[in-house]
């Protein structure tokens, strides 16, 4: 949509405002510059907004809704295939340039705001600032720094003899003083939220469900110091005990909560804690792995999804705010591909209605965007004109939001986003593992030749 000297733009179509209110079938949205000026029924549209001074855009069969919010991204991860690949490969300068490129992919997918849940180096905060001043196209970001981890956390999977990799998306903390120092340094780096690694991902056996990477005292230190500095606090917590400890400590946001139980739910409700389940990552692994993984890994992921389906459905029914997030940045969830899939999962597995799922990816998700959340996530006068126009009705078919070919417009701050797909980019040798074969080449006597196996 080209710029001209009109006063603003009036869009006519089905209006889904981001709340749980039923869509306005004959609706209109008016924006002037970067801000929404009016939203409502066509019959109530003030006369000036109908005139030629406002660009008139009729959108029959289309839905006009807030731009999506992805509540769990990793814009600096570059679609790494493993923790090792992320921690050990790719220079920081190249990672940064790649992050800027990938931010545009995210925006083109209808995601106008995002929460970056952990970064390598300090890429996310600096990219956020570069986008905000207009250097690169991308969503509005709220960001974490490198998440704080202990030896039992997600990121310290390397041998004790090995130095903690500087490229890892975490900082290793060993004492209360180191926790406080890490938080204060990240506050100095202008992060929006302090995130910790509250559990590992080694939930292969049931006994691992009772493991928390930090003590209750350490969790209190994190939540208290983050709050003192005006920052949010968040945790990666899959195990039951890591969820319970963070909830008792008063964290603002819990990622995953796969093994949440009734006690956890009660404390989350009491302390007004949000959950970002991020089931897209697990479901994609299950869908992709039958051809390339062992039974034990598949069983572990299936067990976690089953537990999450039961516990998180209860949490939703109890009224815990849930945010859609995808963990885009890892290879199972490439940028620009899966940002709307979590809504379908919420509907299919957690008992959400499509309208509730949309709300979780719009207005409810603003709760994790402390700096600008009250300016996005809802079609309302005074908020940013961050708008997605899609051919179809996501309240009837939530999957239409996964089909970028159905997007007529994505507006960010009233500016139409260029939706031209980006050309594919070659992966450099220094971005990936250096391996000879994807498996072991063993001699098979019955065949009289070598066979590649696991």
Segments from the language model and where they lie:
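Divalent metal-dependent hydrolysis catalytic cores, especially in the metallo-beta-lactamase
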Residues: 98-124, 137-147, 191-204, 232, ...
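Active-site core of metal-dependent hydrolases
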Residues: 198-310, 323, 328-330, 350-352, ...
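Active-site metal-binding motif and surrounding structural segment of the metallo-beta-lactamase
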Residues: 44-65, 187
